[in-house]
């Protein structure tokens, strides 16, 4: 009886590990659009991915950048400068890291997948926050 219980617990543990790993998708990064958006090949298709929980400054003078400047009381030039810096931080971090995975959490109103990126078991979304490359963002559909 004891052996059966141990075997059942072992099987349950292994299936939990397998199921958890199934939530993650291997991704080949094809483009870093900015500090919080990338493109990558997942399951044979290139998809745009928005990193969940973070919002980086824009890298060009688009309408959203002017809004960021106004809300944060900084110049549009400073917004773009910080946006470019965020993009560089993400590019540098991803350099020479072939084992990148993504865990999808949603799809946004622009039809981008929303998710958490991991490289070498490091949560890249959190890393970007720690580096000061972005602000906390609560995703709204």
Annotate each predicted stretch with a short phrase.
Residues 5-8, 16-141:
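Small beta-barrel nucleic-acid-binding modules, primarily SNase/OB-fold domains
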């Amino acid at each position: 009886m004891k052996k059966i219980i141990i075997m059942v617990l072992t099987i349950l543990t292994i299936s939990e590990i397998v199921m958890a790993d199934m939530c993650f998708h291997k991704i080949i990064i094809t483009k870093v659009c900015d500090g919080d958006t990338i493109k990558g090949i997942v399951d044979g298709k290139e998809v745009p991915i928005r990193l969940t929980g973070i919002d980086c400054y824009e890298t060009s003078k688009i309408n959203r950048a002017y809004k960021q400047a106004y809300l944060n009381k900084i110049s549009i030039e400073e917004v773009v400068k910080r946006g470019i810096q965020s993009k560089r931080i993400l590019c540098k971090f991803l350099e020479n890291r072939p084992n990148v995975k993504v865990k999808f959490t949603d799809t946004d109103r622009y039809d981008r997948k929303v998710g958490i990126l991991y490289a070498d078991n490091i949560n890249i979304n959190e890393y970007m926050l720690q580096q000061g490359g972005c602000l906390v963002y609560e995703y709204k559909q």
